[in-house]
Every structure is written in structure tokens, then in C-alpha cells.
């Protein structure tokens, strides 16, 4: 009888515990969620949900139709240039801007802090937006090149959100916002440099690529017409001839292409460039490459152009003219971080052709590379310390 009573007491206690357990569990879970949300930055499930919803912008940045709406200001703008009719081998880079944006979806998922660079470009002083793409014709290269120049210049000469009261490096002494262009084949750099030169004058060039892209038109493409002479292998030759680049402060890095002959190197030197070949990473190392770039550019302003084919095809297969024996993504990102402190007035990444990609390998690499570029720009605003005069641009 006593044993039966004990059993009934235990059974009743178990029932009460089972009834109370859901409430205890829910309270425990609520406390855990509250603790997690309080302890870590970011916006949790709101940001996670946005990865799969809405239109794709770079890093989930705000989208503005900047070319149509002049009332909005910014410090850094992403701008697509979907142009690929200057290619010599595989086309498809016109889809690069959309592919790179897709590859960037997760950049800001957990807050966007760049650990090696010790900065968060998404949550800093700079107002950064995605301005969409420049509307371009695919039927007339001469018109498209002019459209790129005009679209870029329209954004480049806006009044920035920050530091507009400072003295800048523009020809009129003003501080200008910076544009990061998503290509597109490498031809787009000629109209971009025309835009940059109109605002700043000649600038130093830091160029990551497997190819020189400074060939004379008769060597690369035959130069059958004035329009046909401008392509993704000749734009630096034209930029040099037009006085858009600074003399003897420009540098290529990652070069490993075949040549028509050693005269190509002589012509490249005449265009004002020094060359770091891809294979030199095995002999002089990353630190020496960084030093050569910094020594070449000096303390002046610079423009950064990155062809995705500077990477080995194992790391970036989706490009128009792939070359084996290139750098790894890790090596390139490390070199870029070594450029911290250089005054970049603009940048681009080009030759991403998503149709040749698998598992978004190339577009992810391109997005991560631009994450480093963003970080450099945010860490180094481009202005002088003196008070400025009224800008003629705004």
C-alpha cells in the first residue's frame, strides 16, 4: 500500500513537470535569444532574410537611380558598365555587373567587418550606394564609349556627402566622390580615364592583369578603323597618347601573357608603365611586390584597375581571356591590403563573364576583391587639410 502511494506521488510530480516544461523551455529560449542579440553586432534575421529577397545590389547596399536623380549625395558609388564588344576572345562580360552583385550578397551578412584591414566599410563615415548600370548601346562602340565617359563623369563630379568643405585633389581643388565600376570588358577603362582626367588631370595607374593592354592598335586587332582600334588590349596605349596617365608612375602587376615580341615591353615603357610579372611572386614574394607598387605610385592620387584574369583560372575561370599560372585569390587580396593608405580616386573590376563560371567561383572572388578596395577607400579619404574654394563641379 505504501509502495502504491509512492508511485502515485511520483506520477503526479512527473505530470506537473511535464506541464511546466514548455513554459520553462520557452523562457530559456527567450533568454538565450535576447542574450545572443545583445552580445553580437549586425541585425540578425533581418539581414539574413534580405540575402534572398529584393533586387541584388553590391553587398546589399541601397540602390539609387543616381544618373536620373541628382538630389542624392554619396561618397562612394558602385556603377555598372555592361559593355563587352571590345573583346578579342570570349564575350560575356556585359553580364559582369549583375554577376558580381549576385556574388556579393553575403558580404554584409554578419556586419561586414574586414578583420585584416581592421575596418567596416559598410558601417563607417562613407555613404556608399549602388547606382545601377549605365544605359549602353550594344550596337555602336563609339556611342557606348561616350556613354560610359558621360555616365561616369556625371557621378564623379557630384558633391560628396562627406568632406565637401575640405580641400581636394580635383583640378578646381574640390573633394569628389569615388566611383567603383563593375565591368564590362577592359575597354571601359579608356572612357573612365577620360572622365577622371577631366576632373583630376593625369593620374597614376595601378593595374592588375595577366595582359599588358598597352599594345599599339596595329599589333592588337590591326587598327582597321579608329573605332576598331579601341579595344580591351589597346586602351592604355590610347590613354597614354591622350595624356590621361601620369608619366612613369604607372605599374602593371600579375603579367604573364605572350607577346608579339620584346618590342611590346618597349612600347609599354613608352606608355609610362613598370611591369611586375606573375612569376615574380615566387622569387621576391608578396611584400616586395607591395613595395614596388607603392614606390612606383608614390604619394599622389591613383586609379586602380583590376582584370579578374590576374587570378589563375582555377580561382577565376569565368573570364574572356584566361591565362594559366596566375595568382591565387588569397595572394591578390593580401597584395591589395598592402596598398592601404594609397589615395585611390576610383577603381574598377572587369572581364567577369559569368556564363563561364561554376558555383559562382569567379563572381564571389570579384566581390571579395572589391570588398578590399572598399576598405582601402574608406580608410583613406582623398582630401587635403586646407580649407577649399567653391567647386566649379557643384
UniProtKB/Swiss-Prot annotation:
EC number(s) per entry: 3.5.3.11
Top enzyme category: hydrolase
Cofactor: Mn(2+)
InterPro entries recorded: Ureohydrolase, Ureohydrolase_dom_sf, Ureohydrolase_Mn_BS
Protein's name according to its UniProt entry: Putative agmatinase 1
Pfam families per record: Arginase (PF00491)
Keywords: Hydrolase, Manganese, Metal-binding, Signal
GO biological process: putrescine biosynthetic process from arginine, via agmatine; urea metabolic process
Amino acid at each position: 500500500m505504501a509502495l502504491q502511494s509512492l508511485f502515485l506521488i511520483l506520477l503526479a510530480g512527473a505530470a506537473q513537470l511535464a506541464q511546466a516544461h514548455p513554459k520553462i523551455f520557452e523562457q530559456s529560449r527567450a533568454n538565450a535569444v535576447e542574450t545572443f542579440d545583445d552580445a553580437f553586432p549586425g541585425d540578425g534575421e533581418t539581414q539574413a532574410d534580405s540575402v534572398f529577397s529584393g533586387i541584388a545590389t553590391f553587398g546589399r547596399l541601397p540602390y539609387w537611380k543616381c544618373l536620373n536623380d541628382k538630389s542624392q549625395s554619396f561618397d562612394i558609388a558602385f556603377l555598372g558598365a555592361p559593355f563587352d564588344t571590345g573583346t578579342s576572345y570570349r564575350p560575356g562580360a556585359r553580364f559582369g555587373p549583375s554577376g558580381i552583385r549576385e556574388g556579393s550578397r553575403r558580404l554584409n551578412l554578419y556586419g561586414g567587418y574586414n578583420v585584416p584591414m581592421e575596418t567596416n566599410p559598410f558601417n563607417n563615415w562613407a555613404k556608399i550606394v549602388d547606382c545601377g548600370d549605365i544605359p549602353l548601346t550594344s550596337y555602336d562602340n563609339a556611342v557606348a564609349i561616350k556613354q560610359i565617359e558621360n555616365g561616369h563623369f556625371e557621378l564623379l563630379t557630384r558633391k560628396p556627402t562627406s568632406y565637401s568643405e575640405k580641400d581636394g585633389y580635383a583640378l578646381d581643388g574640390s573633394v569628389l566622390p569615388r566611383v567603383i565600376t563593375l565591368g564590362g570588358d577592359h575597354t571601359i577603362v579608356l572612357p573612365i580615364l577620360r572622365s577622371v582626367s577631366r576632373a583630376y588631370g593625369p593620374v597614376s595607374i595601378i593595374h592588375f592583369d595577366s595582359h599588358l593592354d598597352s599594345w599599339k592598335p596595329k599589333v592588337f586587332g590591326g587598327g582597321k578603323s579608329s573605332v576598331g582600334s579601341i579595344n580591351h588590349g589597346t586602351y592604355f596605349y590610347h590613354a597614354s597618347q591622350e595624356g590621361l596617365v601620369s608619366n612613369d608612375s604607372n605599374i602593371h602587376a600579375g603579367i604573364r601573357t605572350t607577346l608579339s615580341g620584346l618590342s611590346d615591353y618597349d612600347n609599354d615603357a613608352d606608355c609610362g608603365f613598370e611591369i611586375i610579372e606573375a612569376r615574380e611572386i615566387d622569387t621576391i614574394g608578396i611584400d616586395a611586390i607591395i613595395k614596388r607598387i607603392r614606390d612606383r605610385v608614390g604619394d599622389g592620387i591613383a586609379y586602380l584597375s583590376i582584370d579578374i584574369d590576374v587570378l589563375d583560372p582555377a580561382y577565376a575561370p569565368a573570364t574572356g581571356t584566361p591565362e594559366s599560372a596566375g595568382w591565387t585569390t588569397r595572394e591578390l587580396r593580401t597584395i591589395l591590403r598592402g596598398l592601404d593608405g594609397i589615395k585611390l580616386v576610383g577603381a574598377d573590376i572587369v572581364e567577369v563573364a559569368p556564363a563561364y563560371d561554376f558555383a559562382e567561383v569567379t563572381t564571389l572572388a570579384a566581390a571579395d576583391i572589391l570588398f578590399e578596395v572598399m576598405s582601402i577607400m574608406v580608410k583613406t579619404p582623398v582630401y587635403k587639410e586646407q580649407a577649399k574654394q567653391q567647386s566649379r563641379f557643384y
